[in-house]
């Protein structure tokens, strides 16, 4: 049985751990609120950009586009697939990273992908380290994403992603990450981003009635020509989708961290309660033993 001193040390140590995890929970909660406010602002821009692309789709620009001169919609035989994996750099985020990696491995199995026909683009150290150890080619590795990443911070990543596709380093691109649902829930998402197609873009948000309305209103005169317009709009749109995925994943990361630290704090509180009960019982037993010994000694003297 542990001594009273040992139990006291464990209680003291657990209380210190509880203080740390409680502080980390509060920090993560504050970061979550901050990034949610920022995301709402960027969401307005992203929604307008999406509306522009939807209008271009409804105007049948993709039907008449010269895919040979618009790299992001050019479809070619898929010899190599790129997967942009968004994870965190650190732990203490519950099952956040494990979920992304597990589901990405399932995606690879479904698409018959392995080290020979897959290239990894990693935002976050966990994903990069995992796939490096398993022999995958990691051609892009971005660590140290800030708590509230701005577009300027991620600019080099999003531009590199589209540039690699245009240069035929890979022939299709999937973006995989955890989508923030609420403070307690996130869900895995796999978006086949490139090549962009009219069908893909036409499947974006909105009811059939809304799309029909867009189609009626979508009458455009294109200057100088369709190719020039799409070569300006589509890279911005693709880069915006990549940035949105990083921003969404970072939001889910803060939520996962807050939840994990709350769980750790609650567990520490429960453990302290059990240790204090154990301490009180041990002290009571020690006092009872001392009283018995004293009583026995007095009886012997008589």
Curated annotation (Swiss-Prot):
InterPro entries: ATP_synth_F1_ATPase_gsu (IPR035968), ATP_synth_F1_gsu (IPR000131). GO terms for molecular function: ATP binding; proton-transporting ATP synthase activity, rotational mechanism. CDD domains: F1-ATPase_gamma (cd12151). GO terms for cellular component: plasma membrane; proton-transporting ATP synthase complex. The keyword Transport applies. It comes from the Bacteria. Its main location: membrane. It is a peripheral membrane protein. Produces ATP from ADP in the presence of a proton gradient across the membrane. The gamma chain is believed to be important in regulating ATPase activity and the flow of protons through the CF(0) complex. This is ATP synthase gamma chain.
